[in-house]
Structure formats: structure tokens, C-alpha cells
């Protein structure tokens, strides 16, 4: 059987650029071991957004060579080219975290290119990355969420005092303030009282034009890996135990320094009710957001009430050596390489389903 041509896209004009490089290293290594695909490594420059074809995915970002003769051109209806040569890509595995990677942008472009793509499509990606609209949709399905409000920068500037009053009355303090469309806890801060809230909101608006504010609670952090298209598999949840951090921020997530006091428990120590609730909510969340391929769905269990809440959804979860997503899959018997291979198979499956529909009518002369 001839090998399929696979393009691994990583990097990106994103705050999570460096995390993407680390994820890509793991996936590239797995693809090399599988030896089932001709792998084309596509690096997106953080500053310019230019796409470069690399020989491999280096462990050290400093070794990435941005050769002008290796600039990638994408021409809808024709293909993906380097130096006027069609690479004849059969499937793309995007591992660009955050904006342009998880917001439906790359997914939309690949749909126009008519190339199968690992992971969710435009709709699921675009909704999931926007914390505010995602929460509004999940709320309409009666899925339990941490109490929240959201607003645009324009509305906030028109009525600062009214919004601050709403925060006090609806949520009370402390609250956690988040940019609506960023991951890896970037731009997130905690306001413990009214004197701190304005600074926290302004910091979040530096990253996004929409801000989400949630009630801050003492809670256990539970994560759940999900894969599949129509048929969905929910993996055994894991727990993140944070010892020296107020919340699971960027440093807690990605620091590899000795003494980083974050512990991963897989499986999470859950009673039967919590386990069933989390799996049920993960299933319905995946379905109602029309997710495909994979997702990591994060939960909170409030310590004071023992109630379970959906926290956030990641349509392209981290694949680094310390990421929970692959570790939860591995716990249930799906090792890293098999997971990567399965996700590629799901991309072909999703593409085939999409091609079954009628996209246009031919007019008879």
C-alpha cells in the first residue's frame, strides 16, 4: 500500500506558538515510528505568518531554518505547492494552538482546499474557542457551568459602572477574568474585590475584545479526553493537583523546572456519581458543539458544594510530553502512536462523510 502524504502544521501567529512546537515534536516522532505516512513539516512563522516547509520538526526551535526557497503556497482548486511543485497532500494534521489554529481559520482554509483535516471543523472550532459564546450555547442545553457574565470592550467603555455593579450582584468577589479567545491561561487574572476588577478587565482587553468573568471557586481540576466523530469515546478522566499556584496558569501548565508542584493523577480519584456525571457532560458537550476528531474537556468540582461544572473545551489539546490528553488515552490502552494514527483515520472518515452531501446543483442546458 502506498503511503499517504501528510502535512503536519505547527507554530502559528499565536501566543501559544512555543507550545505548538513542543506538541509537534511529539507527533512528528510518533509519525516517524508509525512509518505509514510521508510527512511534510509545515512551520508557520510567529511574526510574519509565512508557511515554510522543513525537513523535520527539530527539538530546538533555534534549529528551524526559514528558507525562502521553501515557502509554501496554497492554491484552492490546485493544491499545496513549494517551488511550483505540488506536494499532493492527502491529509493535514494541524497542531497550531490558539488563534488561527483552533478558531476555525485553518479548518476553513483546508475545507476550501478540499483536504481532509484532523480535528473539528469550522463550526465546532469557532464556537469552542470563544468562551463566551460557547458558554451561552452550553447553557441553553442545561449543561452546568460556573456562573459567568461576558461583555464586549465597546459596551464596557459605554457603561463601566453598570457592568461593575452587575459583576458584584451576579457573581460577587472573588472573580476570575478571562479574554474570551485565548488558551493556556494567558491573560487570566483574579480580582478579589472591586478595587482590583478594573485593572483585571483592562488586562484581559489587551488580549481580546470580549471578556468573560466567572465566579472564582475553590475547586478540583478534572480533565477528560474525548475522540471520535459520530461514535464517541470518553476516556477515564484525570485530575490536576495544584499545590503552589492559585489556579492552573501558564507557568503551572508548561513549566518543566525542577520543583514544579503540579501533580497529575490518572485516573482521577472520583466517586461513581462524579465519574458518571463528568462522562455524561463530556458526551453531550462534544455532541452539541458538533466536535470531531478530538477534544479535551475540562471540569471543575467545587470543593464547598461538590457540584460538577464544565470549565473549558480545547479542540486541539496539547500533545507535549507533559500534556494530559495523550496520557489519559494511554491509561485506557491507546498509546501515543496509536492515538495519532486513529485521529488521522477519523479525519479521513469525517471527510468522506462530508463528500456524501450535495454541495451544488448542476443546471441542465
UniProtKB/Swiss-Prot annotation:
Positions annotated to bind ATP: 168-223
Keywords: ATP-binding, Cell shape, Cell wall biogenesis/degradation, Cytoplasm, Ligase, Magnesium, Manganese, Metal-binding, Nucleotide-binding, Peptidoglycan synthesis
Cofactor comment: Binds 2 magnesium or manganese ions per subunit.
InterPro entries, alphabetized: ATP-grasp, ATP_grasp_subdomain_1, D-Ala_lig_Van_CS, D_ala_D_ala, Dala_Dala_lig_C, Dala_Dala_lig_N, PreATP-grasp_dom_sf
Any one biological process term the GO annotation gives: cell wall organization
Pfam families with a match to the protein in the record: Dala_Dala_lig_C (PF07478), Dala_Dala_lig_N (PF01820)
Pathway(s) this gene product operates in, as recorded in its UniProt entry: Cell wall biogenesis; peptidoglycan biosynthesis
PANTHER family, per the entry: D-ALANINE--D-ALANINE LIGASE (PTHR23132), D-ALANINE--D-ALANINE LIGASE A (PTHR23132:SF25)
Similarity comment: Belongs to the D-alanine--D-alanine ligase family.
General function of this protein: Cell wall formation.
Name of the molecule in the record: D-alanine--D-alanine ligase
UniProt source species: Borrelia turicatae (strain 91E135)
Gene name, Swiss-Prot/TrEMBL: ddl
